[in-house]
Structures are given as structure tokens and as C-alpha cells.
UniProtKB/Swiss-Prot annotation:
It comes from Methanothrix thermoacetophila (strain DSM 6194 / JCM 14653 / NBRC 101360 / PT). The keyword Protein biosynthesis applies. PANTHER family: ELONGATION FACTOR 1-BETA (PTHR39647:SF1). This is Elongation factor 1-beta. SUPFAM superfamilies: eEF-1beta-like. Promotes the exchange of GDP for GTP in EF-1-alpha/GDP, thus allowing the regeneration of EF-1-alpha/GTP that could then be used to form the ternary complex EF-1-alpha/GTP/AAtRNA. Belongs to the EF-1-beta/EF-1-delta family. InterPro entries: eEF-1beta-like_sf (IPR036219), EF1B_bsu/dsu_GNE (IPR014038), Transl_elong_EF1B/ribsomal_bS6 (IPR014717), Transl_elong_EF1B_B_arc (IPR004542). Keywords: Elongation factor, Protein biosynthesis. The keyword Protein biosynthesis applies. One of its GO terms (molecular function) is translation elongation factor activity.
Length: 89
């Protein structure tokens, strides 16, 4: 078994959301079963930006992203959470 890396796209509710404060909120929302590896802001369209988070999970624990997705979706200012990629590293 190994480590699972998941790239997760977090979409803010609007273009008015401060991306730096959203990044801090996402960092604090990472569950104990996961480790935040990287985070970046990606422009989408018309001034809207997405937060891309790479999270590492233990494959022995199932490697599922549901707990992380649920935690991220509860953060204030988050419109949606979508897993873009999952793979073993």
C-alpha cells in the first residue's frame, strides 16, 4: 500500500471572496486523516478563481476523499468542492 494524492478544486461563492482568507480556512479544515501537500489559486473565468488543493491520504485507511470533501464544503464562502484527480504516489 502507499499514499494517495488527491487534487481537489474548491470554488468560492463569488468573485468577492478573499482567496487568502479562504486558503487559511481550508488549511484549518483539513481532517486529521489527511495532510495538505500544496495549494494554489487558478483563474477560471470572468474574474472567478478556484483554489486547488493537493491532499495526501493513507491508502491503508481506504484512501477515500469523502471526509476531506465534506470538511472543505463546510467552510464559509465555499460554493462547491470537486475532486479533479486521484492517484497513488
Amino acid at each position: 500500500m502507499g499514499t494517495v494524492a488527491a487534487k481537489i478544486r474548491v470554488m468560492p461563492e463569488s468573485t468577492d471572496i478573499d482567496m487568502e482568507s479562504l486558503k487559511e480556512s481550508i488549511k484549518s479544515a483539513v481532517p486529521a486523516s489527511a495532510k495538505l501537500h500544496a495549494m494554489d489559486v487558478r483563474p477560471i473565468a470572468f474574474g472567478l478563481k478556484a483554489l486547488i488543493a493537493v491532499v495526501l491520504l493513507d491508502d491503508k485507511a481506504g484512501g477515500g476523499t469523502e471526509e476531506v470533501e465534506e470538511a472543505f464544503s463546510k467552510v464559509k464562502g465555499v460554493e462547491s468542492v470537486e475532486v479533479e484527480e486521484v492517484g497513488l504516489i
